[in-house]
Amino acid sequence: MLLGALRMEERKGLMGRERDQFPVGMRVLAVDDDPVCLKVLETLLRRCQYHVTSTNQAITALKLLRENRDMFDLVISDVHMPDMDGFKLLELVGLEMDLPVIMLSVNGETKTVMKGITHGACDYLLKPVRIEELRNIWQHVVRRKFGNRERNNLDFSKECNKPQSADTDHGPYQPTCGSSDQNGRSSRKRKELHGEDDDEGDDNDYQENDEPSAAKKPRVVWSVELHRKFVAAVNQLGIDKAVPKRILELMNVEKLTRENVASHLQKYRLYLKRLGAVASQQASIVAAFGGRDPSFLHIGAFEGLQSYQPFAPSAALPSFNPHGLLTRTSAAAAFGLQELAAPSSTIQTSTGNVTVGHCLEENQQANLAQGLTAAIGQPQLQQNWIHQEGNGLSDVFSGSSLTNTLSSTLQRVPSSSLPPQELLECKQAKVSMPPSIRIPPSSSALLERTLGVSTNLGDSSISQQGALPIDGGFSADRLPLHSSFDGAVATKLDTSLAASQREIGQQGKFSVSMLVSPSDNLALAKNAKTGASSSGSTIILPLDTARHSDYLQFGGASNSLQKMDGQKQDHIQSSNIIWSSMPSTQLPSDTQIHNTQNQRLDSGSFNHNIGAHLADQTNASASILPQMKFDTRISEEKMKQKNTYDLGSSKLQGGFNSSGCNFDGLLNSIIKVEKDDLPFMDNELGCDLFPLGACI
C-alpha cells in the first residue's frame, strides 16, 4: 500500500515540473505559401520561445508529420494554398495523428470559420496575426494532452475502484488496484471481451452483407435462340401492339421475367428506329445521285423552267432524270451513239432551224405534260399529244413484199383519248436543238411495235395516227418482244424485201429502213441505206412517190423535186430515226411523228431512214424503249452554198431559239385552246416531230 502511494506522488511531481516549463520549447510546424507571412509568423513564434519548423508547401508538411509523429506538438496552417487546400490538410492530420491544428487566413467570414471548426480545427486566426494570440496557443496543446490523459486516468480509476470477488485472499473492502498482476489480468480480460464482441459483430455483418447478394436476380443472357423467340413473338403481335406481358406469354421461357422482356423490347425498338434512319439516308443519297429506283426518286423542277415544280413519280408517268435533259454531243458520233448508249436512250437533233407546228383537232388522243404545276390551274395535267387525221398518206409505205412479212410483227395500239380542253396548241416554234435529250427507260412488261399506226408503251406512246393506217396492207398480228427471234425470221424478212431494196436504191428520194436485230447486240450499221446490220437482217420499206407526189413536192419552184433532181442528188435532206432496244424504267415524255394532210414538206428531196432494233429478250420483265435521233437539213440557201452534205459531220448549234412560241405563250395555250388549223410557211418543214418536253 505504501509503495503505491509513493508511485502516485512521483507521477504528480513529474507532471508539475512539466507544467511549469511547458510553454517554453513547444514544437510548432508553420505552413504558409506566402513567404512574407511565413517569415513574420516564424519570427513571432520564436519570440514566444517556441521551437518552429516552417515550410511553404502543404505536401512537404504532411510528409514531415508522417515521418515523425511525435516530432511536433502543434500545427499552424494557412487555409488557401496552391498545392493543397488547408481544410484537406486539416482532415488528413486529424485522421492520421492526434495533433491540434490552428487555421490562419485573411478571410474572416463566419461561413469559412465555421467550416474550419467543423473540420477539426482547434482555433481560427485572422491575418495579420498578433503576438498576443500566439502566446496563448499553447493551451490547445495542453487541453489535447491533458484531455487524453484525464480520460486514461478516469478509466484507470474505475478499474481500481471495482470490488474484489469473495473467493480472493484480500478483504472484501480492499482495493484491487495495488497489484500490477491484477491490472494486467484485468486489461487482458477487457481486451478479450472486446475481441469477442468484435468477432461476433463481424460475423453478423457478414451475414447481413450476404443477404442482399443472395436476393439479387440472375442476369439474363439473350442468346440467339432466345432472341429469335422474342422477334417471332413481336412479329406475331405487331411492333405497335407488342407489350412485355403478351410477349412473355408467347415466348414461354422459364426464369424470364417481365422486366427482362420490357428492357429487351425497348432496345429492339431503338434498333428498328436506327435502321429506319439509315434507310432514309441511303434513299436520299440514291436520289441525289440520280438512282433509277422509283421508290427512291423525287423529281425536281426542270432546269431553267420556273413554272415546273417537283412531282413524285407515279405508275402513269415514269420518273424523269432532269440532269440528262440537255447535253451536247457531236453529230459525227450520231451513227455510233447506238453502241455507246445501250442503257439509256438519247434523242439528238442536228439541225439549223426546224419549224415545229402543233395542230389541234377535237378528237385528240394520248397523254402529254403530266406533272405541270398547280400555279397554272392544273396540278395533274395529262400529256396531250397532237394528232391530225390525214387520209393522204394511207398507203405511203407500199410494197407487196412487206405485206406478209410484217404481218406478225405489227399491231395497232390506239392511244387513250383526252378532253379537248386539255389539249395543247403551239403555233410555230423554231427550235435549234443540238443537245442530246436523254430519255430514261420506262418500265413495260410487253412492247408491241406498230409501224405507221401506234406504239403504246405503257405510259408512253409513239404513234403515227392517220399518216400510216393499217388498211394499207399491214396485218394486226402482235409479236411480243419478250419472246426471242430466230435466224429464220431474219432471213425471211431480208429475202422478201430484196426487190424493194433495189427499187428504193434507184429512186434515192424517200426511203424507210427498219433493222430487225435477232440478238442482244444493239449496234446499228453505220450505213443504214445499204441494208447492212450487225444483227443480220434489214427491212426496206419503199415509198410510192407517184401516189403521194402532192406531199413530197409543193411550194416554190426552187424547191421542186424535179429541180433538186436536176441540180444534184447529193443534196438530200435526211432524217434518221433510230430505235434501240433497252431496259426501260423511265420515260419523261412520248415522241410522235405526224404527217397530216395539211402539212407540207417543202424540201426538194427528203430521205427518211427509220431503223428499229428489236433485240432478243428472254426475260419477260425486260422491255424495249425507242431511242431516236433526228438529223435534218432544210434551208435551201445552205444547200446551194455547199456541194456535198455529209450526214455524219453536220455541225450542231446549241441553245433554244423561239420565234413564234415562247414559254408564256406555251403555258397560256394549255388553258386557252385555239382550234384553228395553222398553215405552214414555204421553205420550212412543219411536222409534229417533237413532244412538249423536246420543245421546252
From Swiss-Prot:
GO terms for molecular function: DNA-binding transcription factor activity; sequence-specific DNA binding. One of its GO terms (cellular component) is nucleus. InterPro entries: ARR-like, CheY-like_superfamily, Homeodomain-like_sf, Myb_dom, Myb_dom_plants, Response_reg_B-typ_pln, SANT/Myb, Sig_transdc_resp-reg_receiver. Residues 214-273 bind DNA. Transcriptional activator that binds specific DNA sequence. Functions as a response regulator involved in His-to-Asp phosphorelay signal transduction system. Phosphorylation of the Asp residue in the receiver domain activates the ability of the protein to promote the transcription of target genes. May directly activate some type-A response regulators in response to cytokinins. Functions as a response regulator in response to cytokinins. One of its GO terms (biological process) is cytokinin-activated signaling pathway. Keywords: Activator, Cytokinin signaling pathway, DNA-binding, Nucleus, Phosphoprotein, Transcription, Transcription regulation, Two-component regulatory system. Two-component system major event consists of a His-to-Asp phosphorelay between a sensor histidine kinase (HK) and a response regulator (RR). In plants, the His-to-Asp phosphorelay involves an additional intermediate named Histidine-containing phosphotransfer protein (HPt). This multistep phosphorelay consists of a His-Asp-His-Asp sequential transfer of a phosphate group between first a His and an Asp of the HK protein, followed by the transfer to a conserved His of the HPt protein and finally the transfer to an Asp in the receiver domain of the RR protein. NCBIfam families: myb_SHAQKYF (TIGR01557). It is found in: Nucleus. Its main location: nucleus. This is Two-component response regulator ORR22. Residues 154-214 are annotated as: Disordered. It comes from Oryza sativa subsp. japonica. SUPFAM superfamilies: CheY-like, Homeodomain-like. Residues 195-211 have a biased composition (Acidic residues). Gene3D superfamilies: 3.40.50.2300, Homeodomain-like (1.10.10.60). The modification 4-aspartylphosphate is found at residue 78.
